[in-house]
Design a protein with these regions (language model features):
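Pocket-lining segment of extracytoplasmic ligand-binding domains
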Residues: 1-65
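An extracytoplasmic/periplasmic, membrane-proximal ligand-sensing/linker region
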Residues: 56-135
Length: 135
């Protein structure tokens, strides 16, 4: 399949998925859902900004400064992806594409022996927070 790179670093290609995100313990989720929703809204704003090709140069400067690398290398890497906005991410959330990415990632972990058994991805991916932040 076609490769996808999200501003949140979610990368999918063919039968592999390298989903990356933010993690927190269940107790934190229960006590701070409002903070997680606000944080996710901020990530969505960053996705909207970072997905616009007109902003690649500026964003590459930020990334280069933070990572201690040169801007040209960051810009070159930006060409390797299809940076999406939050509207597209929410579409993937709604149509099950995003869930499928995480299920694929989990299958790869099982196949590699990194985890023992399958669990519902809803047990560790906060789809409800993503959805609420998109309202």
């Amino acid at each position: 399949g076609a490769a996808q790179i999200f501003c949140s670093s979610l990368k999918v290609s063919g039968e592999t998925a390298d989903c990356q995100g933010w993690g927190c313990l269940p107790g934190y989720v229960e006590a701070n859902k409002d903070i997680l929703v606000r944080f996710t809204k901020a990530l969505y704003k960053a996705m909207d900004y970072g997905s616009q090709e007109a902003n690649y140069d500026e964003v590459a400067g930020y990334v280069a400064d933070i990572c201690g690398t040169d801007k040209a290398s960051v810009l070159e890497q930006a060409k390797e992806g299809n940076w999406i906005d939050n509207k597209t991410l929410l579409q993937y959330l709604g149509d099950g594409t995003l869930k499928n990415y995480y299920e694929t990632q989990q299958k790869n972990f099982i196949d590699a022996g990194d985890i023992d058994k399958e669990v519902p991805v809803e047990d560790y991916v906060l789809f409800d927070v993503m959805e609420e932040a998109g309202k």
